[in-house]
């Protein structure tokens, strides 16, 4: 018989063997800080609903604006691809919310188990790889001015964007291989989870690859790029580019740290039980990232928000270098007008 913790009722992606013979976790709450299972379920469902309701229309608007912009501004194409990755995740949320509402029962069969969970992992990998490419592009634009108008920039950006999706798909395969539809008896239900079949090496390998390629490696690269840009070229820095990078890591860092703890924690330990209890909320925070970018577009485009949402998105995508150049031209033009109006 399996002794389950609370979290498995709400998490559609957990490591099945970790839930075997876990220690009993106290259910009394002397400080009044514990959630009941019903409150926990409601919090998760509200979170999923909010992400869906904000993310789908928001990302659709951003996708439309960035698609129009990308036809004559290469930089906007990065946000078009990022938005598509976020939309991919957002549209899957109603399907992922159903097992939460049914307290862990998976109604979509083995194919749905494999497909829906793989979509979220693909979205994560594609997003972080695209953000890595965006950071490199911004770095080259700042320190190699000739890069902006170079023909090989267009080719390079397109190659990196396509490679981000292909590599993301490739990195999704290992976890998909171990995904199973599992039968439980107490209570009777089907659960979508990862079953490594007791293979510690497989679990460690997949966790390590996900941590290095989906988190640590991109984090080091992007922190280096944006740190140098912020210190040495603050006036030409693109705040939206930095904001989407920071937002990604705020949302996904707890998830990756949690996966490492789950892989490293001793089996049947109290630490593992506690971590698994918190897992659904950490997963929800990671998925919430898919609704974050539209909010950032509205924030950075707030000066034009009174005109229209489209105008706000256009303003958020503006290039600080172009804006600086425009200000310079206006200043020069104004100076000429003042000189011409001076009495001789």
Swiss-Prot record:
The keyword Phosphoprotein applies. Signal peptide: none annotated. Glycans are attached at residue 3. Residues 1-44, 102-120, 179-208, 267-280 are extracellular. Gene3D superfamilies: Rhodopsin 7-helix transmembrane proteins. SUPFAM superfamilies: Family A G protein-coupled receptor-like (SSF81321). Keywords: Cell membrane, Disulfide bond, G-protein coupled receptor, Glycoprotein, Membrane, Phosphoprotein, Receptor, Transducer, Transmembrane, Transmembrane helix. GO terms for molecular function: complement receptor activity; G protein-coupled receptor activity. Highly expressed in liver and spleen. Lower levels in intestine, brain and kidney. Also expressed in adipose tissues with highest levels in gonadal and ingual fat depots. Lower levels in brown tissue. Disulfide bonds join 113-192. It is found in: Cell membrane. GO terms for biological process: chemotaxis; negative regulation of interleukin-6 production; negative regulation of neutrophil chemotaxis; negative regulation of tumor necrosis factor production; regulation of interleukin-8 production. Residues 68-78, 144-155, 232-243, 301-344 are cytoplasmic. The modification Phosphoserine is found at residue 325. The chain crosses the membrane at residues 45-67, 79-101, 121-143, 156-178, 209-231, 244-266, 281-300. It is a multi-pass membrane protein. One of its GO terms (cellular component) is basal plasma membrane. Belongs to the G-protein coupled receptor 1 family. Receptor for the chemotactic and inflammatory C3a, C4a and C5a anaphylatoxin peptides and also for their dearginated forms ASP/C3adesArg, C4adesArg and C5adesArg respectively. Couples weakly to G(i)-mediated signaling pathways. Interacts with C3 (the anaphylatoxin peptide C3a and the adipogenic hormone ASP); the interaction occurs with higher affinity for ASP, enhancing the phosphorylation and activation of GPR77, recruitment of ARRB2 to the cell surface and endocytosis of GRP77. PANTHER family: C5A ANAPHYLATOXIN CHEMOTACTIC RECEPTOR 2, CHEMOTACTIC RECEPTOR. This is C5a anaphylatoxin chemotactic receptor 2. It comes from Mus musculus (Mouse).
């Amino acid at each position: 018989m399996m002794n389950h913790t609370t979290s498995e009722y709400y998490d559609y992606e957990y490591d099945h063997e970790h839930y075997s013979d876990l220690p009993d976790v106290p259910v009394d709450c002397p400080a009044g800080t514990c959630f009941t299972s019903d409150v926990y379920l409601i919090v998760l469902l509200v979170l999923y609903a909010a992400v869906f309701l904000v993310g789908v229309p928001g990302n659709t608007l951003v996708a439309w604006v960035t698609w129009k912009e990308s036809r004559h501004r290469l930089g906007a194409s990065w946000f078009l691809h990022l938005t598509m990755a976020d939309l991919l995740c957002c549209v899957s949320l109603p399907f992922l919310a159903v097992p939460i509402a049914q307290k862990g029962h998976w109604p979509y069969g083995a194919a749905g188990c494999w497909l829906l969970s793989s979509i979220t992992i693909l979205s994560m990998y594609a997003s972080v790889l695209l953000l890595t490419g965006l950071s490199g592009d911004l770095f080259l634009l700042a320190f190699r001015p000739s890069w902006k108008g170079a023909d090989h920039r267009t080719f390079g950006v397109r190659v990196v964007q396509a490679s981000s999706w292909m590599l993301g798909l490739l990195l999704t395969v290992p976890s998909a291989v171990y995904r199973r539809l599992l039968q439980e008896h107490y209570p009777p239900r089907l659960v979508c989870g990862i079953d490594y079949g007791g293979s510690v090496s497989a679990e460690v390998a997949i966790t390590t690859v996900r941590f290095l390629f989906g988190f640590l490696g991109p984090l080091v690269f992007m922190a280096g790029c944006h740190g140098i840009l912020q210190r040495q070229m603050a006036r030409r820095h693109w705040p939206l580019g930095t904001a989407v990078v920071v937002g990604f890591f705020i949302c996904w860092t707890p998830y990756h740290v949690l996966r490492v703890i789950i892989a490293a924690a001793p089996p049947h330990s109290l630490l593992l039980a506690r971590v698994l209890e918190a897992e659904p909320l950490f997963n929800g925070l990671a998925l919430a990232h898919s609704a974050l970018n539209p909010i950032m577009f509205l924030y950075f485009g707030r000066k034009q928000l009174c005109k229209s949402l489209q105008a706000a998105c256009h303003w958020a995508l503006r290039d600080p270098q172009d804006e600086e150049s425009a200000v310079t031209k206006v200043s020069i033009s104004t100076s000429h007008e003042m000189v011409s109006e001076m009495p001789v």
